[in-house]
């Protein structure tokens, strides 16, 4: 089992952007189920680290439920657009004001 831990290299990309993991759940759910299905009791730092992605876990869950998000966007009057390395969230408040948030990665 020690051999299975050795081939776990750090992220493949030289520059690692945690926000990219939030936006691209395809790359994140692969490491997460491995950690959840193989709980190592002798790696407490890993468990501490799992808490950090758990905050993003809610984000990856929500991006996993894209139909639900689209359904909510119709009711809540907000939309998300992804263009290249930027994500734009546009929302309308009940008072009619429009709020736009753009994340550039």
From Swiss-Prot:
Q: Give a short account of its post-translational modification.
A: Phosphorylated by host ERK. The phosphorylation triggers a structural change that enhances keratin binding and protein stability.
Q: Which family does it belong to?
A: Belongs to the papillomaviridae E4 protein family.
UniProt feature, compositional bias: Low complexity: 24-38, 53-66
* Other remarks on this protein: The major E4 form is first synthesized as an E1^E4 fusion protein from spliced E1^E4 transcripts, such that the first few amino acids of the E4 protein are derived from the N terminus of E1.
| Primary location class | host cell
- What residue spans carry the Basic residues bias annotation? 39-52
Q: How does it assemble?
A: Assembles into oligomeric complexes. Interacts with host CDK1. Interacts with host SRPK1; this interaction may favor expression of late viral transcripts. Interacts with host cytokeratin components KRT8 and KRT18.
Question: Its biological function?
Answer: Contributes to multiple aspects of the viral life cycle including viral genome amplification, suppression of suprabasal cell differentiation and egress of newly formed virions. Induces host cell cycle arrest at the G2 phase by associating with and preventing the nuclear entry of host CDK1/cyclin B1 complexes. Inhibits cellular DNA replication by preventing loading of host replication licensing proteins MCM2 and MCM7 onto chromatin. Within the cytoplasm, associates with host kinase SRPK1, a splicing factor regulator, and inhibits its activity.
Q: Where in the cell is it found?
A: Host cytoplasm; Host nucleus
Q: What is this protein called?
A: Protein E4
Give an example GO biological process. symbiont-mediated arrest of host cell cycle during G2/M transition
Q: Where is this region: Disordered?
A: 24-85
Q: Does the keyword Ribonucleoprotein apply?
A: no
Q: Which organism is it from?
A: Human papillomavirus 57
A GO cellular component annotation here is: host cell cytoplasm
Q: Which UniProt keyword terms apply here? A: Early protein, Host cytoplasm, Host G2/M cell cycle arrest by virus, Host nucleus, Host-virus interaction, Modulation of host cell cycle by virus, Phosphoprotein
Keyword Ribonucleoprotein applies = no
């Amino acid at each position: 089992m020690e051999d299975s831990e050795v081939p776990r290299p750090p992220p493949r990309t030289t520059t690692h952007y945690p926000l990219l993991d939030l936006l691209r759940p395809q790359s994140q759910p692969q490491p997460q189920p491995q950690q959840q299905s193989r709980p190592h009791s002798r790696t407490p730092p890993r468990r501490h680290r799992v808490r950090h992605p758990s905050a993003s876990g809610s984000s990856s869950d929500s991006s996993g439920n894209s139909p639900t998000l689209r359904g909510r966007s119709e009711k809540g009057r907000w939309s998300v657009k992804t263009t290249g390395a930027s994500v734009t969230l546009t929302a309308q408040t009940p008072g009619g004001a429009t709020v736009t948030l753009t994340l550039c990665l």
